[in-house]
Amino acid sequence: MKTLGEFIVEKQHEFSHATGELTALLSAIKLGAKIIHRDINKAGLVDILGASGAENVQGEVQQKLDLFANEKLKAALKARDIVAGIASEEEDEIVVFEGCEHAKYVVLMDPLDGSSNIDVNVSVGTIFSIYRRVTPVGTPVTEEDFLQPGNKQVAAGYVVYGSSTMLVYTTGCGVHAFTYDPSLGVFCLCQERMRFPEKGNTYSINEGNYIKFPNGVKKYIKFCQEEDKSTNRPYTSRYIGSLVADFHRNLLKGGIYLYPSTASHPEGKLRLLYECNPMAFLAEQAGGKASDGKERILDITPESLHQRRPFFVGTDHMVEDVERFIREFPDA
């Protein structure tokens, strides 16, 4: 049985940014995930369910667990003195860690994706993304350090809190998964070099918004529902409403996750920096593909911390199909 810590040290030589700092950074995220796991499991017994009464910068009502997870991860990262600053979906601006100007890395995160599902005991997750800063080491970080395209990521991953808690990550050398053993307090390797199945047959989208979707996406959904034995259609529809949970299932089983633009969210709803980029990095490392329908997600240069983007991610041929439908059936 190999632990996450042992695996990270063993694999350091495989990537160009191998440093003790990155190992310690991933260890800090691991600690934050353990704390969140513990408190999610007893959320119904203590007063951390439901809305906090506050809103985040996007105008969305923050759940109590959103704020809890944000603070715990922030504290775990700051305590190691290896991160110069963070950007979070739950923070209006970047958070500069005083006294950590010497650090090489910045972290972007969605502390608790799908937190509205907690009240009904459905899987949620944590998403993280790590970059090397671009401003000189020894100076405070600036927003420039965070507004980098996804192809500059050093590492990315997620933790899914479900029937078991799993941490999945990449440093650009494949995707690896670890299951948390609460009796031992360690994450143990369960899958190495994960790959999307070559053929997918699941599509994940909130079809309740169908009337608001672009024409190409509507056509693609109909394509998924048509019967064609040569392409194993109709596909199966599965939608949890938690990006991490939907992505994880499709990674294991083969499929596509779709969150297109809508009439009410013409720029899309998912955040480029906190959700799209890390999941796109993982997808490509697992042999999949990620797109906004027209452009590779990892090639997009962000313009603002909380920028949104349409998002299509999963098995490569399925993402290519939806891109083709968007090209062939543009909105009038």
From Swiss-Prot:
It is an enzyme of class 3 (hydrolase). Keywords: Carbohydrate metabolism, Cytoplasm, Hydrolase, Magnesium, Metal-binding. One of its GO terms (molecular function) is magnesium ion binding. It is found in: Cytoplasm. InterPro entries: FBPase_C_dom, FBPase_class-1, FBPase_N, FBPtase, Fructose_bisphosphatase_AS. Its EC number is 3.1.3.11. Its main location: cytoplasm. The keyword Flavoprotein does not apply. Pfam families: FBPase (PF00316), FBPase_C (PF18913). Mg(2+) 2 binds at D110, D113, E275. Pathway: Carbohydrate biosynthesis; gluconeogenesis. The keyword 4Fe-4S does not apply. Homotetramer. It catalyses: beta-D-fructose 1,6-bisphosphate + H2O = beta-D-fructose 6-phosphate + phosphate. Belongs to the FBPase class 1 family. One of its GO terms (biological process) is fructose 1,6-bisphosphate metabolic process. It comes from the Bacteria. Mg(2+) 1 binds at E89, D110, L112. GO terms for cellular component: cytosol. Binds 2 magnesium ions per subunit. This is Fructose-1,6-bisphosphatase class 1. Substrate binds at D113, G114, S115, S116, N206, Y239, Y257, L258, Y259, K269. NCBIfam families: PRK09293.1-1, PRK09293.1-3. Its cofactor is Mg(2+).
